[in-house]
Amino acid sequence: MPPANANEYDFIIVGAGSAGCTLANRLSEDARVLVLEVGGWDRDPWIHIPLAWGRMMARRMHDWMYSTEPEPGMNGRRIEIPRGKVIGGSSSINAMAYVRGHRGDYDRWAGSGLTQWSYAHVLPYFRRQECWEGGTDQYRGGDGPLSTRHTTFSDPIVEAFAAAGAAAGYGWTDDFNGRQQEGFARRQVTIRNGRRCSAAVAYLRPALKRANLHIEVGAHVNRVLLDGPRAVGVEYASAGGDTVRAYAGREVILAGGAINSPQLLMLSGIGDPEELRSHGIETKVPLGGVGKNLQDHLSADVGYTRKTPGQFHREMRLDRILIDLAKAYLFGSGFASDVPGGITAFLKTGLDPKLPDIQFLFRAGSLAAQPYLPPFLPSFADTFGCRVALLRPKSRGRISLGSSDPRAPARISLNFLGVEDDLKAIRAGMRMAVDVGRQQPIAPFVGAEMTALKTDAEIDAHVRATGITVYHPIGTCRMGSDSDSVVDPECRVRGVDALRVVDASVMPDLIGGNINAVVIMIAEKAADMIRGRPALAPSNA
């Protein structure tokens, strides 16, 4: 048992990402909460300027710097997996997309035994989290912490791409987070007053004035402390290098995400006994599902050169972009206060007759963009394109320990294209994107097809050689009603009292879209469970 003079709290939350920030706000309304985050505070101006997300991704700023093991289905390449290592977690470095997924995703969860996670049950928590620019209706929330709106990026090529989608026979949806997901649509983003609205901005900062909420940055958690079958606290290395033990009177909650949470469970002796034994770790709780069931969205790009320079290229000239960045950071206005692209789409290949299985992410600028100033800094080629993402892969990977050293990175195997159906689906999606790019409305902008994909073999080779993730790893502490799951329907770790996992790792399978909104929803719903409060009434929308 912990000594009487220990650091004692009601709850200890490991990780201040999308879920951790949400939990910190809700639980500290009436309890003593310690949040441990290995990264630093989100004071870097680049975090808060929407346009700068590309720079942060390219330079892997505030990032765990994870990469996979060599991927057999991707020509043996190691694929980068950016994960936020900063207050706000990945919500502080992502592209700010606000996507809930398809209602069928949650009804599928309910059909597997997670009856309290149907669309009717989760919609009220999506509504509670957001402050939508259009106000409250049966689908949207108008007074929540997380600001959401349509992108305002304007360039004739954006409207042309949407028109090309219509010419190719695809419909339009005014709100893919509302009644209908399928179709082309304006992107929705988490931006407030021209600046990134991360989970830290939305949830954590408003709660910092509470004396019962303590945030410690630079804290690397080594293991969960167990007293018999009960979690009683954590051991961590502080920013100063000291080994510290903190104790939780009520619960320890892991919110480190789909890579770090299963790793911490295994380091604590909770996992597959054979794997733990291979690293010299004593098995405290045998739980074979820990680290299994890893999923992520695979994507590949269809690219074009642009005939005449567009707005993105013009604004990247050094003198202009410096002014734009200053305006965005200081006043939340101007070109850099939004993300270029404007259009997304959720489409059916026909391989899954019920749900859209492909997402388009249109980009109105070059992936290699850098500030330029002739004749001193040469310009980059002006390009645009469409990233095609496979929404519901059948392939499953895993997270395993690289070492018993808590500082050593976990081993990540995505197993992309491990199932043939995944290759068929993304191949079909790539063909759809190529077809849209050949429609008349977009033709005036197209200089040349950079990818020039015609045959199945060319598409397959392109995907294997260039495909990347969309940075949505989930599933490694799978929630379920069956004994093989890692957590039960209330996110409680099986076989351990007072220990929960609340983050993307508990998702049983991937939803049809970006996952930040989903992780916040899970944390909102879990907060009610943890506090013993009645769940919000199911929606009939």
Locations of regions flagged by a protein language model:
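N-terminal glycine-rich phosphate/pyrophosphate-binding loop and immediately adjacent elements
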Residues: 2-127, 286-287, 297-306
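FAD cofactor-binding and catalytic pocket of flavoenzymes
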Residues: 303-423, 469-473, 501-504, 508
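Residue-level detector of alpha-helix initiation sites
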Residues: 13, 17-18, 152, 258-259, ...
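Internal hydrophobic alpha-helix adjacent to the cofactor/substrate pocket in enzyme cavities
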Residues: 165, 281-282, 431-438, 524-536
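A conserved FAD-binding loop/helix module that cradles the flavin
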Residues: 510-530
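A glycine-rich dinucleotide-binding beta-alpha-beta segment and adjacent secondary-structure elements
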Residues: 51-52, 67, 184-187, 191-192, ...
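Glycine-rich loop(s) and the adjacent beta-strand/alpha-helix scaffold that form part
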Residues: 32-33, 39-42, 224, 233-324, ...
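Conserved redox-cofactor binding core of oxidoreductases
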Residues: 110-231, 235-237, 301-322
